[in-house]
């Protein structure tokens, strides 16, 4: 964890770390390649099965949102109005409608591009969230921010006078120029990132937030701040390219230490989201 410790009245005590009870105003979106094994994790299947009215699985493709290669991706989300175009070729992109091939393939993209959401898809995600929740401020926790595509898109839109009340707090295990903290989500949860976000964005409110009887989530709700926890979870052990190394043939069962660690982290994350959002 590279973020400097907050001031004394805002320490991450064990009670605060474990205080995951949910109140109103939180949503989540999980994202991973649609053709990989992430969706087959027991914790993900149970999440969808236990909350069919509250959690949706949405599949789309990058080529329907401005990129010149297909890459199918899926979202597991509580945003009922998040409705991107179906994946190509189910909904043909403009190249396929002209009877052409996609100009490029994901394997030819840069590492940064491969690990970034298309700007138009980010627009749809954030606009759906803002239409679902009416609030004075919108706090997006980018739990696995990678190369910072969400933070970059928000800055671009704000330069155009849009989304001026949207705040992004970026976490990633790898420290980059856009990251605000570097929490290992095998050991922490987004609850800790919420504390860091308040400390970063509204430092004059940290004492008030930390002393709120309902914890920081209730303080945010009382302050008319709504939260979206977005997690584009690392896909290396779930994507088709890595299955031979990380998973036993034909299923999601892990055979590498990296895969076991990824499964543990995602189970930990989903457990937090179930407890904090879906009560």
Task: Walk through the language-model features, giving the residues of each.
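Conserved active-site and SAM-binding loop architecture
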Residues: 1-279
């Amino acid at each position: 964890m590279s973020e400097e410790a907050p001031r004394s009245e805002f320490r991450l005590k064990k009670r605060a770390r474990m205080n995951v009870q949910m109140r109103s105003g939180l949503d989540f979106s999980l994202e991973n390649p649609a053709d990989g094994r992430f969706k087959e994790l027991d914790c993900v299947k149970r999440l969808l099965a236990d909350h069919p009215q509250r959690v949706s699985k949405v599949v789309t493709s990058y080529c329907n949102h401005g990129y010149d290669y297909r890459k199918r991706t899926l979202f597991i989300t509580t945003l009922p109005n998040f409705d991107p175009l179906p994946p190509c070729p189910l909904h043909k992109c403009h190249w396929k409608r002209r009877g052409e091939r996609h100009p490029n393939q994901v394997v030819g993209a840069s590492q940064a591009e491969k690990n970034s959401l298309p700007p138009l898809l980010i627009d749809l995600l954030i606009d759906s969230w803002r239409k679902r929740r009416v609030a004075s401020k919108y706090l997006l926790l980018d739990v696995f921010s990678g190369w910072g595509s969400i933070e970059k898109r928000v800055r671009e839109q704000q330069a155009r006078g849009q989304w001026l009340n949207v705040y992004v707090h970026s976490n990633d295990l790898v420290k980059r120029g856009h990251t605000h903290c570097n929490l290992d989500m095998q050991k922490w949860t987004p609850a800790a990132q919420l504390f860091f976000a308040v400390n970063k964005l509204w430092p004059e409110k940290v004492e008030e937030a930390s002393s709120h009887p309902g914890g920081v989530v209730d303080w945010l709700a009382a302050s008319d701040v709504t939260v979206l926890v977005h997690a584009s979870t690392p896909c290396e052990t779930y994507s088709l390219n890595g299955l031979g190394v990380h998973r036993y043939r034909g299923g999601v069962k892990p055979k590498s230490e990296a895969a076991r660690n990824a499964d543990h982290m995602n189970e930990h994350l989903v457990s937090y989201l179930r407890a904090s959002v879906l009560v």
